[in-house]
């Protein structure tokens, strides 16, 4: 967890001072989502959590910075595992809607209370949360995700209900055909 936090902090700092170059390229989101999801299979299995992929068979093409998009998906899946209960599922899905590729990561964890929902995704607030194995979360990874998604022409949002899990989603524009 510490290496991920340090990596996020470094990327966030570089991004905020304009030292992180965005390199756009044509990418197949199906391959990216599947590849990043598979990386977490072993980590999830340590908590007896199953990662379920719901992705289309056909190519979902976008023009984006692949490293940024992978970082976003990694952070969302890592958080979902952190906040999910043992023996549950994390669902990673990809869909096309209104000219956008939509990636969603749904957990079956504790959810986020209304007060912390208001604080999430804002740089001027701070709070700590704890995962199901007492792993601490600072919110920095989500700020980085939001920043990277915006730099790729999309947006990040979430739905959550205390006691009923959370779904974090982001959109990026599809490659024009």
What are these regions (language model features)?
Residues 13-24:
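Helix-loop junction within the histidine kinase core
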């Amino acid at each position: 967890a510490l290496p991920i936090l340090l990596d996020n902090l470094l990327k966030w700092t570089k991004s905020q001072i304009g030292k992180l170059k965005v390199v756009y390229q044509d990418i197949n989101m199906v391959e990216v989502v599947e590849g990043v999801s598979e990386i977490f299979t072993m980590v999830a299995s340590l908590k007896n959590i199953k990662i379920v992929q719901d992705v289309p068979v056909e190519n979902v093409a976008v023009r984006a910075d692949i490293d940024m998009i992978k970082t976003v998906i990694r952070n969302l899946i890592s958080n979902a595992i952190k906040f999910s209960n043992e023996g549950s599922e994390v669902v990673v899905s990809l869909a096309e809607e209104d000219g956008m590729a939509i990636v969603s990561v749904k957990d079956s964890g504790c959810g986020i209370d209304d007060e912390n929902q208001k604080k999430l995704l804002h740089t001027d607030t701070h709070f700590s949360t704890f995962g199901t194995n007492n792993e601490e979360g600072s919110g920095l990874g989500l700020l980085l995700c939001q920043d990277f998604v915006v730099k790729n022409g999309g947006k990040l949002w979430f739905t959550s209900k205390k006691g009923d899990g959370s779904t974090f989603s982001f959109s990026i524009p599809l490659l024009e055909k």
